[in-house]
Amino acid sequence: MQARRTRLALSALAAAALAAACGGGSGGDMGSSGTATSSSAASSKTVLPDVFALEPRLSREPMNDIMTGELLPIIDRLFDLVRAQGLDTELQGVKVFAPNSGDKFLPGKVAIGFSYLLLNSSPSDPKYQTYLDGYRAIADMTIDVVNETWGIYYYTSALWKLKKAGYLDGPTPAVNPATLELLKTKLDWRIFVDEANNYALKNGLPTNYYGVAFSIARLRYLLGWEDASGSEALLQKMINHYKTFSAYGFSDETDGSGRFDRYSILLIGEIWQRLIETDMQVSAEDEALLKGWLRQSVDVIKLRLNPAGNGVDYGRSLSAYADTAFCEVLSAAEHMNVLTDEEKEVAYAFATRVAAKYVEFWYDSDWGSLNMWEKGRRTDSYRGKARILGENLSLSHQLLYTNNLWKASGFAQKKPMATPQFVQYLQALPSSTLTKFAGFDGQGATYDRGLVTYRDGLRVISLPVVNGAATYHRTNPYFAIPHSYNMLSGVADTQWPQLQPRFTFANTGTPQVLIPASYQKNLQTQASADGRQLQVTWQQDALDRVAGTGSGSQPFKDTRITSSTRFDFEPGQITRVDTYTPSGAQAISKVELEFGSFSSDVTALGGNRFSYASGDVTGFEIEGLQDCTVADVSADTNYNTPGGALKTSIRCSSPAFSFEQPLTIKWVLKYRSGSIASFKPN
């Protein structure tokens, strides 16, 4: 209790610092893809001491100092490990180069990660010769290790950086000529792109791989390995996909199904980073399009900025990548002069926080490694612990190369803006915004895809209304529910019914299960004049069948139940009301809903009402379901989020019934208004 009182008390130091702060900012025009309400400052005029206590310790230092003082030494230790153990390298119990490791990108990530040791040293450095000889030996050693797609890009990027720095020339190059000749054949985008079939992606790869293929083709051209035709064709393929499947400037990760997530915000940043990296010139028309899309991503990111360096909070492939995605977009936007001068300062301050969070939270000093997999953390199965070395190096690469852009713009030794000034800018951002991704044309067959952002002071809450599409539509990181760092979260690859009901039919055979996902339309928002209250509504003309006959990887439209949904956001409280209507009598065996929370010490108050004594959530109540129980889930890996373990779950259900009349399910979630998400769970 004492710690909580301390967090919720205004410190004299914080008040004095704020009084002295200057500057600030405005949310500004959100562009055609979004509608914004008035400033979030309306809900929080003061800053709690949380801001100073819960931001990363190093976030007030120059980003480049974090790179040289913290990150490069981490890479150096990993380099020594690989150099000493070779293909038998073991990190945290993982034989990283084992044939069955599952890391299909590792040689490329090794090449790019360890290249920074050479690129940041000189012949006078005591370890220079060790780096040079070790890099050459590792390149020889990994030549036959599986390396696909992203790994091919990372390797070609590393070679181009080394070539520009002169490390591929002379009597003792960083890569042996014979090995380089083999790499020329192995590092080819045609391995995963069907050039003869209009440059179609092979094996069902998601559309962000167009950017990967383009990057490889362009780098091969710069290395003198092929002509420019491949990169030019792939660039146009990528731009055309954007034009076709991004009506509001964000890339659908599928061909029109409506999966808008971290990649949708990031992809335009990746495209610009590859253009910058390879000095690729595009037509004036394409440049205007690309800059416009980049600005759209910047506008979404601005709404989500926070003191802790936390990034995207819903969808797949989060963990540390959720944070670095913002760094990649913002550094590209700064380089291309898409940001105002004030925005550049704010973006740099946030990027520094991301870097500080990485070395203070994601990096586990006891492990000597990044940790995205244990101690309460969990990520998508395809980013399993078998990829531990590669994930260390690719994330380090993202921080290092974006830092290089900041250095090139004069930020090398610059401290970020002071915390009070940064916070003042954040408090002037809009309280709520609807960012449109797709739909909104009023057509009966169209489903709306968008992202609602609600800011309660410095607390950022997301409401994604998207389609997880193939594989992900039934997993709760894509549910249309609130997400907020260290308060409300889904869990990678899990399907338990977080904050939305799951209907199980009483049919024979495999029970059919429906959830309210994938088919939202008429998405609308309405905010109060002061921006403190926000109402969000939509309807569904069908639910998504996620189990039983007809279900599968793709969403399955089941019209036996339709629904209408209303969310009400206000400081300290979120309310959801759903009305489900059957098309005739339906035999239901059960309806279930859960609320998995970081809060604990739960007290049942009766009538399906609960209070919490510890954590940012203070209360939860539900109507429309009969029975609720409380479970301790702190040791259950199915409740491990990217950042840490959920502690409790309130599990509600109703027994079998004949579903003939509309059913209303309502829940109210109360939380500490003005609470601030730390860079790590409390």
Predicted segments with their positions:
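Extended polysaccharide-engagement surfaces of secreted carbohydrate-active enzymes
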Residues: 307, 311, 315, 324-642
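Bacterial Sec-dependent N-terminal signal peptides
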Residues: 9-46
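Low-complexity, Ser/Thr/Pro/Gly-enriched N-terminal "stalk/linker" regions
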Residues: 42-129
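Extracellular polysaccharide-recognition and catalytic grooves
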Residues: 178-432
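An alpha-helical repeat/solenoid feature that recognizes helix-turn-helix modules
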Residues: 98-120, 145-165, 206-223, 259-265, ...
